[in-house]
Amino acid sequence: MNFTVTGLTVETKGMTSEQLEDAKLFSGKNAGICYMGDSYYDSAVTDPIKATKRFVNTCNNGHHSIADHVRIEVLLEGSSKMLAIVLNSLQDYATSEKSGRYTIMTGNSERETVLYDKWKEIFHNRIIELYPTYDDATLLKKFEKKYPESGYAVRCGKLIELEANLDVRTDMEANNYFRDVIKADTTLPSWKMAQENARYVLSVFTYSTTFGYSTSLRQWNYIYDWCQKYINQFAPQYDMDYIKWERTNGKKGKCVLLSKFTGIEASYFETRLYFDLLKLSNFIYDNMYVEELRDNKNRCFEFLTTLSGVEDHPMKGYDLSCYEPDGYTGDFNYTPDTRSSDDYFGLTYNTSYTASFVHIAQAERHRTLKYFMFFNPNLSEHEFFVPPMLLGTDYVEEWLSDLNSVKDLIPQATKVCIVETGHISDFILKCEERLCGRAQLEIMQQTSITASKFLEDVDSGAITNKACINYVEKLRGESGKIKTKCKMLSCKEGCVWGSKNALTRLI
């Protein structure tokens, strides 16, 4: 048995027509493996002319998987979060995205930016109020880097002298340094967490997301087709408005899109996504388009369900009525225990819940599971996620009021309905990542809720499949409660919560 590397991803800046031809040639060589009589290198498989012809013929016969051997990475800078969410819903990809926790974000409008700065301060103060020791370890580390063996400790964000190891002058300098430099450092954990929560007020179409996205030559061409399927459900009302709006990235004028199905004006959400997908599809067409690699299964961006361009999407039939507001009061009355009549838990499962755009952006990183979004952008009122650290305070009303003031821009706190489906073995993998003190809070809480429903159905006898029960028992801790990541795996990451507090924290 022999092993030989035949292909390798290399770094490049831009893609030339020659590189695209090389990609097609390599795919054509792989197509020849299926029927070669001799070895790979000593046969007609690697003949350039035959390989090129073979690529075209194989693709025209509908066998496109040969183009999956070529992986192409695109760096998207200044992208919207929504475009990243759509691309990350496709499962066949690798992505590296600049984190909202470690990045000071800016909104598209002054309204968003003002709210982001305001809530970043509020969240920071609230974090320190709830967890006064949250920054202590980092504060001490930074202090000791300049003043080692100083005899000081840090407790609740304050310097505490344990031993008088410094002379009077140095001691004064050290205290001033701690107060004026270290305590003002916006890279402290509390500030990073504040930034992570403040991004909820920014539009899902805030163009400050940067990520590298890798997938195959085939998939890039399918993405082009799915972009076109979304785009082709709309038509600009006036061509000149469309041109002006497109050239200025939506900063000048207004472009009105009309649905070809209903004649109704497209919402802000639909219009922004239209231009995002238009720009992406234009880039693909200019750099990676291969005529023979058209999607021959008539698919779409399944994640978008009824917004995908498929007028009567099959997932439209999933019962989500339990998440609708009360017809009289307008209140949302569902609880974490709420289940749709279509939810099912077994070896394969499907479950529904509501989630913010921030949450679903995290959830999609579990690529072995599939997610479907249900969102009506034309509703006059939307539900918003409220960070648990605000619950029970006067901030809740202010938070909701501020979000309502920018609701037309679709802030990332906007909640949508999600249907999650997959195999329980893959859900276990999700639990091993997300039932953790380091995981984003909203997805950690929902993962815990879904795990609890599996345990409930085993305990009640609703799940009888022995294989499924064996998987579910992996989630059960010694006390019968849900295990955390550090109890399921040998976790080496630093964490201030531990297994005891990971699932009950408020930040």
Where are these regions (language model features)?
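A conserved ligand/cofactor-binding region detector
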Residues: M1-I507
